[in-house]
């Protein structure tokens, strides 16, 4: 039988596929990184399962996470999303998506890509942590605090150290698969 991290909800096929096919896989595509960062910001105060279940609706609402298109969304477009029952209708998070797209574009301009900026924090290599049980893993680290501080300085919203650590794990910069998970250190 396949051994996965114990946090995976085995009753939800989206959750299983997310763990097996995405979570912890080193990600270098700026658009995919933007989508993942947005998803982590939506999670604040909610379950990851809720965000995953609404992922496709978010993609449709935010132009497939085309960064320039999201950065150019009007206040009216964003306000209209508050009426969309298929997404998380939190005004601050919806407006943060546009602000984050704008900040993302500035970082792309400065570094050539968000990928180059992001991976510079780990010197281009995945950090593999010892995680016998995810319940004992820290919610934030010095790395996530450093990146969160820099993102905030650059105008990003909803990117505190806990959300940032989740993002780093999901994007494969930090391998926090449990030690007995078949996906541990698979990259």
Residues covered by each model-derived region:
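HhH-family (HhH-GPD) DNA N-glycosylase catalytic core used in base-excision repair
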Residues: 1-187
């Amino acid at each position: 039988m396949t051994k996965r991290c114990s946090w995976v909800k085995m009753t939800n096929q989206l959750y299983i596929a997310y763990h097996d096919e995405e979570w912890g896989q080193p990600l270098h595509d700026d658009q995919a990184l933007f989508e993942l960062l947005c998803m982590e910001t939506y999670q604040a105060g909610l379950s990851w399962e809720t965000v995953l279940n609404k992922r496709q609706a978010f993609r449709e609402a935010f132009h497939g996470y085309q960064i320039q298109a999201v950065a150019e969304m009007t206040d009216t477009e964003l306000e209209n999303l508050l009426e969309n029952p298929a997404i998380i209708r939190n005004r601050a998070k919806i407006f943060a998506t546009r602000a984050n797209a704008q900040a993302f574009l500035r970082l792309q301009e400065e570094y050539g890509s968000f990928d180059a900026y992001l991976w510079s924090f780990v010197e281009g290599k995945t950090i593999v942590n010892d995680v016998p049980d995810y319940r004992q893993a820290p919610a934030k680290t010095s790395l996530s605090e450093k990146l969160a501080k820099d993102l905030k300085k650059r105008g990003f919203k909803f990117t505190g150290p806990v959300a940032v650590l989740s993002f780093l794990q999901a994007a494969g910069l930090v391998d926090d698969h449990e030690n007995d998970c078949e996906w541990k250190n698979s990259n």
